[in-house]
């Protein structure tokens, strides 16, 4: 009897291992049905809970894992769903929906090749399955978008890469790799808010994602927030020490910051030659950093203006606004250089651009000044006519008049052609006009200030150049021209 009891005990211990408990099976089915009901109501969290209870009761039922995988997919938890789908086909390799869900999870996560294998297996089991056929096409399309994007990235056609990634993400919405590539290209295109949004979204789900940290840093770096950018690059390298892009970006950011600061220091100390060299070196570090390079060009333009290399300064400022057409400081610097080189039309154009952007009193006055100088430049330039500087003294103006008046006097050219005589007479008259204005302090002041423009000129209607000439040289008999052969004259003054 003792032996029989011992045997019963042994039988009681092994029965649960050999026979499935019918009650457990029924309870598991009940949980599954409740899960189905919640799934139908789109209450996926409750559906997940009941499918989990069913699995706990019967862990070897493939359909339970398949159902829970479907629920996790609806919740966007594709990696967990993939695990359940894979378990379902391990338990039952003929489970077509299990293979479909496995493929769908692979595709959603961006593994198109693995997805193709799953869909192929589903088609082997059911070659007419329309869903498997369509999903197989989708997976192949994603692989094609990946290939195109890879080639276009090397070509630096970032707009095309963004397009390809958008198409791929329609089938692979949970693929961080595609999102990161898109975000990086958005950053390269200067679309920083969009790039930051994508990277931040990934970091909310995975704060240790080195690629997302790199892209966040890249956006800050290209927005000229270099110190903050370095912090993100360092964090990315902490998560992935071999992250090559983060390493290069971090090195460039530090070098750019150092060179720019050294250039600023040299400029403040008045060492313009050194500042020029440092800004030039900084410009060679990273041609992709548009905002920082725009500032560097403007800074170098300022240095060139200090060195009175005004055309070089204009070129630097032009490069700055090409990189950043909203850069007010560069427009102002270039406009001043245009004023200094008497390119008034260009100066007016730049000041108009500035005033349209920032309607301040200061900018309005700068525009008015440039417009006045432009008007003044279109009238006769009496200083040029006499060949004197704007700061010329009274004696210098008189000497210049004496020289030019004698040079262009009609009597000197009496033997020339009618055309030459006419031109010299015109110049003689202009010389007289110039002397009349510049030798009179009041008229000169009005001319210099542009008041004559508002007064519709200097009213030279009664002007006679010969009278000015006679008065200057002492009246009739005070001078004479004597010809000595063609083109030769002697001037004799009383």
Swiss-Prot record:
Cellular component per GO, a single term: cytoskeleton
User: Which parts of the chain span the membrane according to its record?
Assistant: none
Where are the annotated TPR repeats, by residue?
28-61, 62-95, 96-129, 142-175, 210-243, 256-289, 294-327, 328-361
**Source organism, top-level taxon:** Eukaryota
**Molecular function in Gene Ontology:** heat shock protein binding
Expressed, tissue-wise, as follows: Widely expressed with high levels in liver, skeletal muscle, kidney and testis.
- Report the subcellular localization: Cytoplasm; Nucleus; Cytoplasm, Cytoskeleton
Sequence positions bearing N-acetylalanine = 2
Q: Mind listing the UniProt keywords for this protein, alphabetically?
A: Acetylation, Chaperone, Cytoplasm, Cytoskeleton, Nucleus, Phosphoprotein, Repeat, TPR repeat
InterPro entries from the UniProt entry: DnaJ_domain, J_dom_sf, TPR-like_helical_dom_sf, TPR_rpt
The family database entries (CDD domains) matched by this protein are listed as: DnaJ
Quaternary structure (record)? Associates with complexes containing chaperones HSP70 and HSP90. Interacts with the GAP domain of NF1. Interacts with HSP90AA1. Interacts with HSPA1A/B; the interaction is enhanced by ATP. Interacts with HSP90AB1. Interacts with PGR. Interacts with RAD9A; the interaction is interrupted by UV and heat shock treatments. Interacts with HUS1 and RAD1. Interacts with NR1I3; this complex may also include HSP90 Interacts with HSPA8.
State what this protein does: Acts as a co-chaperone regulating the molecular chaperones HSP70 and HSP90 in folding of steroid receptors, such as the glucocorticoid receptor and the progesterone receptor. Proposed to act as a recycling chaperone by facilitating the return of chaperone substrates to early stages of chaperoning if further folding is required. In vitro, induces ATP-independent dissociation of HSP90 but not of HSP70 from the chaperone-substrate complexes. Recruits NR1I3 to the cytoplasm.
Name recorded for this polypeptide: DnaJ homolog subfamily C member 7
Q: What species is given as this protein's source?
A: Mus musculus (Mouse)
Q: Gene that codes for this?
A: Dnajc7
């Amino acid at each position: 009897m003792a032996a029989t009891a011992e045997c019963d005990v042994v039988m009681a211990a092994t029965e649960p291992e050999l026979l499935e408990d019918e009650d457990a099976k029924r309870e598991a089915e009940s949980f599954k049905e409740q899960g189905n009901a919640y799934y139908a109501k789109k209450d996926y969290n409750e559906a997940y809970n009941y499918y989990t209870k069913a699995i706990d009761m019967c862990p070897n039922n493939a359909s339970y894992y398949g159902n829970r995988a479907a629920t996790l997919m609806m919740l966007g938890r594709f990696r967990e769903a993939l695990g359940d789908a894979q378990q379902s086909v391990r338990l039952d390799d003929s489970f077509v929906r299990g293979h479909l869900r496995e493929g769908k999870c692979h595709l959603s996560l961006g593994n198109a090749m693995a997805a193709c294998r799953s869909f192929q297996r589903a088609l082997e089991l059911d070659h007419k399955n329309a869903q498997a056929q369509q999903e197989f096409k989708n997976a192949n399309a994603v692989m094609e978008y990946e290939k195109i994007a890879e080639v276009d990235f090397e070509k630096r056609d970032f707009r095309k890469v963004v397009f390809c990634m958008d198409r791929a993400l329609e089938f692979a919405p949970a693929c961080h790799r595609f999102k990161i590539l898109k975000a990086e290209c958005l950053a390269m295109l200067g679309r920083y808010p969009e790039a930051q949004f994508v990277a931040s979204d990934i970091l909310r789900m995975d704060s240790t994602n080195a690629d997302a940290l790199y892209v966040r840093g890249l956006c800050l770096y290209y927005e000229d927030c270099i110190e903050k950018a370095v912090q993100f690059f360092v964090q990315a390298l902490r998560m992935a020490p071999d992250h090559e892009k983060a390493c290069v970006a971090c090195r460039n950011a530090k070098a750019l910051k150092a060179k720019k600061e050294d250039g600023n220091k040299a400029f403040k100390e008045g060492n313009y030659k050194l500042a020029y060299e440092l800004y030039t070196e900084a410009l060679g570090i990273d041609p992709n950093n548009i905002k920082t390079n725009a500032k560097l060009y403007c800074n170098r333009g300022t240095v060139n203006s200090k060195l009175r290399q005004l055309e070089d300064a204009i070129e630097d400022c032009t490069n700055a606004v090409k990189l950043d057409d909203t850069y007010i400081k560069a427009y102002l610097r270039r406009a001043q250089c245009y004023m200094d080189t008497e390119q008034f039309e260009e100066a007016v154009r730049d000041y108009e651009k500035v005033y349209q952007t920032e309607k301040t009193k200061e900018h309005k006055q700068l525009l008015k000044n440039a417009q006045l100088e432009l008007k003044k430049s279109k009238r006769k330039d009496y200083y040029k006519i006499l060949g004197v500087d704007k700061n010329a003294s009274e004696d210098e103006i008189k000497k210049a008049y004496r020289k030019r008046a004698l040079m262009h006097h009609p009597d000197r050219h009496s033997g020339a052609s009618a055309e030459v005589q006419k031109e010299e007479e015109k110049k003689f008259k202009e010389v007289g006009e110039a002397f009349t204005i510049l030798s009179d302090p009041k008229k000169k002041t009005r001319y210099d200030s542009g008041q004559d423009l508002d007064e519709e000129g200097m009213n030279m209607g009664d002007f006679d150049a010969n009278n000015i000439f006679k008065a200057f040289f002492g009246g009739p008999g005070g001078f004479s021209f004597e010809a000595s052969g063609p083109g030769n004259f002697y001037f004799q003054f009383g």
